[in-house]
Amino acid sequence: MEKFRVHGPFTLSGTVDISGAKNAALPILFAAILAEEPVILTNVPNLKDVETTVKILRKLGVVVERAENNAVHIDASKIDHYVAPYELVKTMRASIWALAPLVARFHQGQVSLPGGCTIGARPVDMHIAGLEKMGATITLDEGYVKAEVNGRLTGARILMDKVSVGATLSVMMAATLAKGTTTIENAAREPEIVDTAIFLNKMGAKITGAGTDTITIEGVERLGGCEHHIVPDRIETGTFLVAAAISGGRITCRGTKADTLDAVIEKLREAGMQVDVTENSITLDSLGMRPKAVNIRTMPHPGFPTDMQAQFTLLNVVANGTSKITETIFENRFMHIPELIRMGAKAEIEGNTAICHGVENLSGAEVMATDLRASISLVLAGCIANGQTIVDRIYHIDRGYEHIEDKLQKLGARIERFNAPFEE
């Protein structure tokens, strides 16, 4: 099993090129199922989840070719299979996005329920409710969600029970080929939804309102090919800005968009950091200062993103002062805190709130990653801790951060990936 070995502490400074956003690349790759002509995507990050998505597409009969400079060529004109199988879906919850484009274009589709996810637990039920309102018949059989419709889906007014990025994307994709007009109310507003809508419109869809809480989709009969550049990853950007803030460094993130990160930049400035913005870059200069503690409350976009919560937990455990972090989006998203406590952090969890008491130094330790964002916070903790930190289960990081050790090494990190023997 692969692990990271980090020898801290050190200052992280320099320039980093930001990759394409995983959270835009995945739905856009699945949305390419809707196209009857070839599609070319650029700025597609080289990640485990992208690799899994490509495997699912190929299983359906889509021709997918990787090209230079993170380009992907997709031809979905000869799809001959309508089932996304368990052996691929089990590793990635985002696989549910295959269902809506399949049923919209081919009037049928089957997707294995993502591993450990029953209908009603996560918002998989909202994806299904949206398709049902558009006329699909949904059955659950032997662990597979099966969707069928006679003829085309029908446009509908769909009011989301709660703000859900995944369900908003599913309904938006399905509605592009539906008969009539669909409105999504209480829609998620994330930049990745906007990027997916731009991609679909390039293929001939008629979508307005993406980025607001009401999206309108006028159905069309077919979608064609296009070229599209994936939006930069705002979460990767925020992660590297935090890396500079906690290590006393100065980092410039190139090829990114500040207007997708307003809530994060505001909190970094509140923490005492100097943040300068251009059209395509963000620079954070810590001025060699220890950050001030900042209170965080995660919210749907444009509020503070849940995917930056773990990184700001780390910032707060080494900040000057005491802070509260309230997680309103996901349950069980404080699993990094016990690991940070092993490194000398002082924090306690009360329900959906963590209270952090800043300490001046962390100590290296053996820690275990539990999910994608928690894992990167542990790696960054190792960068500022005294001594050696070993981070286990780093496959989580490879799901969402492209070339992470290379990028950190260029900023001054002493980090290496190594293979450890499997231990019972």
UniProtKB/Swiss-Prot annotation:
It is found in: Cytoplasm. Pathway: Cell wall biogenesis; peptidoglycan biosynthesis. It catalyses: phosphoenolpyruvate + UDP-N-acetyl-alpha-D-glucosamine = UDP-N-acetyl-3-O-(1-carboxyvinyl)-alpha-D-glucosamine + phosphate. The keyword Cell division applies. The lineage of its organism: Bacteria, Pseudomonadati, Pseudomonadota, Gammaproteobacteria, Pasteurellales. One of its GO terms (biological process) is regulation of cell shape. Keywords: Cell cycle, Cell division, Cell shape, Cell wall biogenesis/degradation, Cytoplasm, Peptidoglycan synthesis, Pyruvate, Transferase. This is UDP-N-acetylglucosamine 1-carboxyvinyltransferase.
